[in-house]
C-alpha cells in the first residue's frame, strides 16, 4: 500500500476513536489476567465460556486479513463468485464440525487437534501435524500483521517495517497477559467493532452507485461483465471470472479446503474447546455460521463497489492492486468520524486474526511439542511460562513472515495456497481416521506426509511453470483435491500391511466406538429443542442454499 495516494485524511475525532479502541483492548487483556491460575486457564480459558461468547469469537477469529482485505479483493477481481467462500466454502463445514466432530474433540478432553491425532494414530503423526500447524500459524499470522501494517502505513504514513512492529507489539501485549480469555473476549468486542466499521462502506458505496440495481448495471459494464453477477452460471467450464469448474468449486473448495480449514484448524477449534460444556462446544461453530452467512455484504459487495468506482483497480503493483479495494473506498467515501470507526474496524479485524494464529501456536507448541517431546513432567507453572515465551516467539517470527505476504498482490491467493498445503492433507487423514476405525497408525503418518508432499509439489510445479491452471485459486482447489485423494490412496495401501489399534484404544476417538452421544446435551442442561445443534445446523445450511438463488 505504499505511497501517499492512500493516505487517509484523519482528524482528531478519528484518532480518538482508534486510541480508545487500543486502550480498551489492552484493558480487556489485563482484566483477563486475573482469571489465569493454571495453564488450562491460559490456553483454553478453563473450559468455562458460554456458547454465545465462543460463537462470536469463532467467527471473529476468522475475520482477519483473509476475510476483509482478501475477500474484498476477490470481490473486485472475481465478482459474485466470491460468495462461494462463504455459502459452500464455510457454512456446511462449520455445521459439520458442530454436529459430528465436536463430540470427539470435546468428549475426548484433548487440548489440541494434534493431540487428537496422537491418541488416534501415533506420536510421529502427532509430531508431523504439530510442526506443520505451527509453521502454518506463523505464516498466516504474518498475513494478518502485514495487512494491519498496510492500514497503519496508509493511516499515519509510517514505514511498513515500523507499522508491522507496532501492530505486533499490541497483539503481543494482550495475549501474553490475558491468554486465550484475553484473545476471546477481545474477539467478541472486535466482532462488533468490525461490523460497525464496514457497514458504512457498503451503505455509502451503494448510495454512490445508485443502489443495488445501479451496482449491477455498473458491474455489467465493467471488465467482469454479466459473469461478475453470477455464482454458478458458467462453471460448466473454466471460462468464468474465477477460472474454476464447478467440480473444483464443490470438491476442492466446498469439501477439501473448507472442511480442512473449519474442522481441523486448531486456531478455530480452540474457541469451541474453551466452551463450558459439550452442548456449548457443539453450538459454537453453528452460532458462528449465522453471521458468516451475511459477511459478504461487508466484504464482497464493497469489492464490487471498488471495481466500478476506482479507476484502474487491478494493477499488478502500486496503490491500485486489488488488496487495496477497501482502503481506497475508505479514502474516497467516508467522512471523518465514520472514517475513524472504519479504520478501527479494520485494525480490529487484523488483530483478531493474528491473535487467533498466535494463541493457537502457543498452545500447540507448549503442549504438543515442548511438553510431549522435551520436558514432559514439569510443573504447571513451567508450562504457563513456556506458553508466554512461545507467544513472544510467534509474534517475532510473524514479523518476518509478514514480509513474505508482502510479495503477493492478492493475499487471498497466498492464504488459499497455504490452506491447500497444510489443511487439506490433515483433513483427509483426520476424516478417514475418524470414520474408518481399521486405519492404522502408520497409515495415518504416511497419508499425512504424502498428502502434504503432493500439495506442496503441485504448488511449486505451478509456480515453476511446469503445469498450468487458469488462476492461482484454481491451483489451490485442485492442489487440495489431489492432496485429499493421495491421503485416501495411501491409507488404503498402507492399512492392510500394518497393525491397527484395538477397539479399546479407539473408544471415544472414532465413529461407532464413542461414549459421547447426542444425549450429552441433556446432561449439560441444554436439552431445549431450540438449542439443538442439529436443528440449528440444518437451518443454517438451508439458508446458505437459499442465499444462492438471487445470484445463481
Task: Give the location of each predicted region.
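Membrane-embedded helix-loop-helix hairpins and adjacent transmembrane boundary segments
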Residues: 2-552
Amino acid at each position: 500500500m505504499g505511497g501517499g495516494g492512500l493516505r487517509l485524511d484523519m482528524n482528531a475525532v478519528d484518532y480518538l476513536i482508534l486510541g480508545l479502541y487500543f486502550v480498551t483492548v489492552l484493558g480487556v487483556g489485563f482484566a483477563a489476567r486475573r482469571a489465569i491460575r493454571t495453564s488450562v486457564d491460559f490456553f483454553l480459558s478453563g473450559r468455562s465460556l458460554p456458547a454465545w461468547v465462543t460463537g462470536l469469537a469463532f467467527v471473529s477469529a476468522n475475520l482477519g486479513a483473509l476475510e476483509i482485505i482478501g475477500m474484498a479483493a476477490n470481490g473486485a477481481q472475481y465478482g459474485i463468485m466470491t460468495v462461494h467462500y462463504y455459502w459452500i466454502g464455510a457454512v456446511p463445514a462449520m455445521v459439520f464440525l458442530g454436529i459430528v466432530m465436536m463430540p470427539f474433540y470435546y468428549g475426548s478432553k484433548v487440548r489440541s487437534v494434534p493431540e487428537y491425532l496422537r491418541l488416534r494414530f501415533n506420536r510421529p503423526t502427532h509430531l508431523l501435524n504439530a510442526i506443520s500447524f505451527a509453521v502454518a500459524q506463523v505464516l498466516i499470522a504474518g498475513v494478518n500483521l502485514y495487512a494491519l501494517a498496510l492500514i497503519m502505513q496508509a493511516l499515519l504514513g509510517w514505514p511498513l517495517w515500523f507499522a508491522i512492529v507496532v501492530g505486533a507489539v499490541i497483539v503481543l501485549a494482550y495475549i501474553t497477559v490475558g491468554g486465550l480469555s484475553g484473545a476471546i473476549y477481545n474477539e467478541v468486542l472486535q466482532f462488533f467493532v468490525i461490523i460497525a466499521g464496514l457497514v458504512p462502506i457498503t451503505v455509502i458505496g451503494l448510495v454512490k452507485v445508485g443502489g443495488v440495481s445501479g451496482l449491477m448495471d455498473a458491474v455489467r459494464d465493467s471488465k467482469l461483465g454479466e459473469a461478475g453477477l453470477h455464482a454458478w452460471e458458467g462453471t460448466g467450464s473454466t471460462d468464468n471470472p474465477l477460472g474454476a469448474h464447478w467440480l473444483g468449486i464443490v470438491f476442492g473448495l466446498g469439501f477439501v479446503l473448507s472442511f480442512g480449514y473449519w474442522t481441523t484448524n486448531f486456531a478455530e477449534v480452540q474457541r469451541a474447546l474453551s466452551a463450558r460444556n459439550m452442548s456449548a462446544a457443539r453450538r459454537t461453530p453453528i452460532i458462528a455460521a449465522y453471521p458468516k452467512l451475511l459477511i459478504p455484504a461487508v466484504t464482497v459487495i464493497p469489492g464490487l463497489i471498488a471495481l466500478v468506482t476506482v479507476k484502474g483497480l487491478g494493477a499488478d503493483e502500486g496503490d491500485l492492486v486489488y488488496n487495496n479495494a477497501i482502503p481506497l473506498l475508505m479514502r474516497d467515501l467516508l467522512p471523518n468520524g465514520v472514517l475513524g470507526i472504519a479504520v478501527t474496524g479494520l485494525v480490529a479485524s487484523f488483530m483478531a486474526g493474528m491473535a487467533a494464529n498466535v494463541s493457537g501456536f502457543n498452545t500447540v507448541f507448549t503442549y504438543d511439542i515442548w511438553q510431549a517431546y522435551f520436558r514432559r513432567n514439569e510443573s504447571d507453572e513451567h508450562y504457563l511460562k513456556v506458553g508466554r515465551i512461545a507467544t513472544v516467539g510467534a509474534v517475532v517470527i510473524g514479523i518476518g513472515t509478514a514480509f513474505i505476504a508482502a510479495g503477493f498482490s492478492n493475499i487471498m491467493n497466498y492464504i488459499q495456497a497455504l490452506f491447500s498445503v497444510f489443511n487439506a492433507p490433515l483433513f483427509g487423514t483426520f476424516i478417514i481416521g475418524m470414520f474408518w476405525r481399521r486405519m492404522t497408525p502408520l497409515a495415518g503418518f504416511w497419508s499425512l506426509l504424502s498428502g502434504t508432499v503432493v500439495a506442496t509439489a503441485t504448488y511449486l510445479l505451478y509456480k515453476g511453470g511446469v503445469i498450468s491452471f487458469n488462476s492461482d485459486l484454481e491451483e489451490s482447489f485442485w492442489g487440495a483435491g489431489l492432496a485429499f485423494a493421495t491421503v485416501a490412496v495411501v491409507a488404503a495401501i498402507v492399512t492392510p500391511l500394518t497393525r491397527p489399534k484395538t477397539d479399546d484404544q479407539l473408544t471415544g476417538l472414532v465413529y461407532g466406538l464413542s461414549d459421547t452421544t447426542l444425549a450429552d446435551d441433556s446432561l449439560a442442561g441444554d436439552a431445549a429443542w431450540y438449542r439443538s445443534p442439529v436443528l440449528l445446523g440444518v437451518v443454517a445450511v438451508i439458508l446458505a442454499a437459499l442465499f444462492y438463488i438471487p445470484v445463481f
